[in-house]
A protein has these predicted regions:
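Positively charged, helix-rich recognition surfaces that bind polyanionic ligands
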Residues: 1-8
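Polybasic, proline/glycine-rich intrinsically disordered low-complexity segments
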Residues: 187-191
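Extended, charge-rich low-complexity interaction segments
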Residues: 194-200
Length: 209
């Protein structure tokens, strides 16, 4: 009986581990960037840009503590940004591209492998989603008008999913797929930039100068 109980427990443990592993595999794979840019920190003498790039299955909320700790490693008064790719990455395509890189690039640097792998996964052919980002730098009172114009320009039978995010310099408007933007951009090209497989600034620290 004890043996049967142990066997049952072992089966349960194996199954739990299997479920955990499967859950991790099913989580969206995203590319992130922590960066303190030169142009954001011109007020600091002899400033040198810092950056940290990697792939992750964690959400922006789960990574906030990591970003805060990374920011604290910088200089006093340093302005730091946390970016996350709007589109999840295709794991299998990224693996294929990495294998090609390892085969054909004799100078592949193992020291910077993590950043290199993230760079490979960031290629547009490795995108698992097709979201677009509009970088909206107009005044906030124009935002609703812009979103309504997006809806009017999209002629598909299935409505777009639209997200709005505050950024350090304005707003980011993310749509769930592409559409014909010619009419939209003819009206808004002075204050809006379309960026397709782009990174979203999800958090920042310090005061921008």
């Amino acid at each position: 009986m004890e043996k049967d109980l142990n066997a049952a427990l072992n089966i349960k443990i194996v199954n739990i581990k299997g479920v955990t592993k499967m859950a991790k595999e099913n989580k969206p794979l995203k590319s992130i960037l922590f960066v303190s840019r030169n142009k954001d920190n011109k007020h600091l003498p002899d400033f040198k840009e810092r950056r940290y790039v990697r792939l992750t299955t964690k959400t922006a909320e789960e990574l906030k503590k990591d970003f805060d700790n990374w920011s604290k490693q910088g200089r006093e008064g340093e302005f730091c940004r946390f970016y996350m790719k709007i589109n999840a990455r295709d794991r299998e395509m990224a693996k294929k591209k990495l294998i090609q890189e390892l085969i054909f690039n004799d100078n592949f640097d193992l020291v910077s492998a993590e950043a290199k792998i993230a760079g490979i996964a960031n290629k547009k052919e490795c995108a698992a989603e097709r979201k677009w980002l509009f970088d909206f730098d107009d005044t906030e009172d124009k935002l609703e008008e812009f979103i309504n114009d997006i809806k009017d320009c999209d002629k598909a039978s299935v409505p777009l999913e639209i997200e709005v995010h505050k950024t350090p310099n304005g707003h980011a408007v993310i749509v769930s797929r592409g559409f014909d933007t010619r009419e939209l951009m003819n009206k808004w090209n002075a204050t809006v930039e379309l960026k397709k497989d782009e990174m979203l600034c999800v958090d920042w620290s310090g005061k921008e100068n």
